[in-house]
């Protein structure tokens, strides 16, 4: 008989005490067993890739804005008063500056003269 586990046919075994010269042993085809293979296959893979892309885009936009101004310019204008410029020009103008000095002299009131008494000695002179 063939080996049951191998599933092959035409194989046979002979005993050590059987003389092959006079005996022919014929084996029947053996029936093989069935089996299932189980296994877990794992694998890792790495890969690199490159790509290029182009794109176009268009867009339109509208906007409105409002604003209010502050009166900070007023303070600056006060610093540049015309009166200051006039005084500077009068002082720095060569040949155009005229200095006039006017003195007011007040004469104090004269006290009344005391009466003069003439003596005879003065009159006789």
UniProtKB/Swiss-Prot annotation:
<feature type="repeat" description="5">
    <location>
        <begin position="39"/>
        <end position="40"/>
    </location>
</feature>
<feature type="repeat" description="12">
    <location>
        <begin position="53"/>
        <end position="54"/>
    </location>
</feature>
<feature type="repeat" description="22">
    <location>
        <begin position="73"/>
        <end position="74"/>
    </location>
</feature>
<feature type="repeat" description="17">
    <location>
        <begin position="63"/>
        <end position="64"/>
    </location>
</feature>
<dbReference type="GO" id="GO:0048511">
    <property type="term" value="P:rhythmic process"/>
</dbReference>
<comment type="function">
    <text>Essential for biological clock functions. Determines the period length of circadian and ultradian rhythms; an increase in PER dosage leads to shortened circadian rhythms and a decrease leads to lengthened circadian rhythms. Essential for the circadian rhythmicity of locomotor activity, eclosion behavior, and for the rhythmic component of the male courtship song that originates in the thoracic nervous system. The biological cycle depends on the rhythmic formation and nuclear localization of the TIM-PER complex. Light induces the degradation of TIM, which promotes elimination of PER.</text>
</comment>
<feature type="repeat" description="1">
    <location>
        <begin position="30"/>
        <end position="31"/>
    </location>
</feature>
<feature type="repeat" description="21">
    <location>
        <begin position="71"/>
        <end position="72"/>
    </location>
</feature>
<feature type="repeat" description="25">
    <location>
        <begin position="79"/>
        <end position="80"/>
    </location>
</feature>
<feature type="repeat" description="23">
    <location>
        <begin position="75"/>
        <end position="76"/>
    </location>
</feature>
<keyword id="KW-0597">Phosphoprotein</keyword>
<feature type="repeat" description="2">
    <location>
        <begin position="33"/>
        <end position="34"/>
    </location>
</feature>
<keyword id="KW-0963">Cytoplasm</keyword>
<feature type="repeat" description="19">
    <location>
        <begin position="67"/>
        <end position="68"/>
    </location>
</feature>
<feature type="compositionally biased region" description="Gly residues">
    <location>
        <begin position="30"/>
        <end position="84"/>
    </location>
</feature>
<feature type="repeat" description="27">
    <location>
        <begin position="83"/>
        <end position="84"/>
    </location>
</feature>
<feature type="repeat" description="18">
    <location>
        <begin position="65"/>
        <end position="66"/>
    </location>
</feature>
<feature type="compositionally biased region" description="Low complexity">
    <location>
        <begin position="85"/>
        <end position="112"/>
    </location>
</feature>
<feature type="repeat" description="20">
    <location>
        <begin position="69"/>
        <end position="70"/>
    </location>
</feature>
<feature type="repeat" description="16">
    <location>
        <begin position="61"/>
        <end position="62"/>
    </location>
</feature>
<keyword id="KW-0090">Biological rhythms</keyword>
<feature type="repeat" description="4; approximate">
    <location>
        <begin position="37"/>
        <end position="38"/>
    </location>
</feature>
<feature type="repeat" description="15">
    <location>
        <begin position="59"/>
        <end position="60"/>
    </location>
</feature>
<feature type="repeat" description="13">
    <location>
        <begin position="55"/>
        <end position="56"/>
    </location>
</feature>
<keyword id="KW-0539">Nucleus</keyword>
<feature type="compositionally biased region" description="Polar residues">
    <location>
        <begin position="116"/>
        <end position="125"/>
    </location>
</feature>
<comment type="subunit">
    <text>Forms a heterodimer with timeless (TIM); the complex then translocates into the nucleus.</text>
</comment>
<dbReference type="GO" id="GO:0005634">
    <property type="term" value="C:nucleus"/>
</dbReference>
<feature type="region of interest" description="28 X 2 AA approximate tandem repeats of G-[TA]">
    <location>
        <begin position="30"/>
        <end position="86"/>
    </location>
</feature>
<keyword id="KW-0677">Repeat</keyword>
<feature type="repeat" description="24; approximate">
    <location>
        <begin position="77"/>
        <end position="78"/>
    </location>
</feature>
<feature type="repeat" description="9">
    <location>
        <begin position="47"/>
        <end position="48"/>
    </location>
</feature>
<feature type="repeat" description="28">
    <location>
        <begin position="85"/>
        <end position="86"/>
    </location>
</feature>
<protein>
    <recommendedName>
        <fullName>Period circadian protein</fullName>
    </recommendedName>
</protein>
<feature type="repeat" description="3">
    <location>
        <begin position="35"/>
        <end position="36"/>
    </location>
</feature>
<feature type="repeat" description="11">
    <location>
        <begin position="51"/>
        <end position="52"/>
    </location>
</feature>
<feature type="region of interest" description="Disordered">
    <location>
        <begin position="1"/>
        <end position="125"/>
    </location>
</feature>
<feature type="repeat" description="10">
    <location>
        <begin position="49"/>
        <end position="50"/>
    </location>
</feature>
<feature type="repeat" description="7">
    <location>
        <begin position="43"/>
        <end position="44"/>
    </location>
</feature>
<feature type="repeat" description="26">
    <location>
        <begin position="81"/>
        <end position="82"/>
    </location>
</feature>
<feature type="repeat" description="14">
    <location>
        <begin position="57"/>
        <end position="58"/>
    </location>
</feature>
<dbReference type="GO" id="GO:0048471">
    <property type="term" value="C:perinuclear region of cytoplasm"/>
</dbReference>
